[in-house]
Amino acid sequence: MDVQFLGGAREVGRSAILVNDSLLLDYGMLTGNPPQVPLDANPDAVVVSHGHLDHVGALPSLLSGDDRPPIHWTPPTRDLANTLARDTLKLHGGTLACPFTETDVHRMSEVSVTHGYGESFDAAGHEVTFYNAGHIPGSAHVLVEDSDTRLLYTGDFHVDDPDAGGVGGQRLVAGSRARPDADAVIVESTYSDVSHDPRGAVEERFAERVARTVWGGGTVVVPAFAIGRTQEILMVCDAYDIDCYVDGMGKDVTRSVLQYPGFLRDADALRRAKGHARFVTGRRGQKKRIADQNTVVVTTSGMLSGGPAMTYVPEIAGHPRNLVAFTGHQVEGTPGRELLDTGQAELDGQRTRVSARVDQYDFSAHADRDGVLEFLESYRDAAVLVNHGDRCVGFASELRENGRDARAPERGETVRV
């Protein structure tokens, strides 16, 4: 089996892997100005691991010509990919920064084929099976089989902590458990050098600080990714009796994933959390009034690169009793990272100094180092191809030192497994 890395090799973003010159796994986009896309591909079929921009962002561009390869995914992933594509059009449509058109996005629905977990199907002459990856609703490990080789593409994944009491993982989705036999594994390595704190401890620190801020007369803005993180934080707030508003794309995503209770750990808990939260429907004036209420606002974007956070954060920036509570990693070069590092950031075109307290809480939906190593324990004899990380080469070297057959391919490289 030949595996070519078109993107996501030795980097996080624009994931794309071509199997046997015919089956494409993911086709993502690396955010930036302009966004970066993988190397060109002309597949016979596409299989998608999950609905995050770095895995689906460039998908519509595959349909810009005469070819119409079928796109295989879970139902939640299909819906999330469409939401992201339309958001990209809203932000960049009609410019050179957008690699596709409204027509291309419409064509995705024409070639869409959905599958559940554990249901094998044919794609470009390969037998393919999805398994829950525990990352976001609908996320999948992808097992690809031809006549000679079984290849497991982990996609992004998260595992529960079996030793944790109470909250051992995400509230939104159950962790990855399936370990199908495979001859080769393409494994993500986003946090291959990081150990996450126990999820229960992170939740408690977050809830305590948020509640203390509100009791002290402050307002809390929680920048959160629309997909996965907004829903997770809603459930945490509900579990700790914290009232909150929700704004941004996360509102639509919450409604969307609730259509698929079988892809959630506890759909009733998310439904209850949604019912207790207040969804913001007004414009800038209402947002400013909410920011003055000493309340909690969960809003996009997670790294302060846009969205309603551009209104809320400047409104609360001037007083130290307020709080900006980041819930995810802040990538170098983003306003969120700048705010963490310097106490100021460019928000909506204005340089803003933030006197409010700024905290960060690790609600990661990726496996940490122990989680990745635990996963790979089931594949001692398999070839390991490390991707989706900033230190793929280093992690592959560590695996080889432990007797593994491991390597970190470069973008454009083809590996035979």
PLM feature spans:
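His/Asp/Glu-rich metal-coordinating catalytic cores
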Residues: D2-V47, H52-V56, S61-G228, E232-I233, ...
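Haloarchaeal acidic low-complexity proteome signature biased toward cell-envelope/secretome components but also
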Residues: M1-F5, L23, P38-N42, S64, ...
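Acidic/glycine-enriched edge-of-secondary-structure segments
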Residues: L152-T154, H158-D160, E188-H196, A267-A273, ...
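Hard-cation-handling environments
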Residues: E208-T327
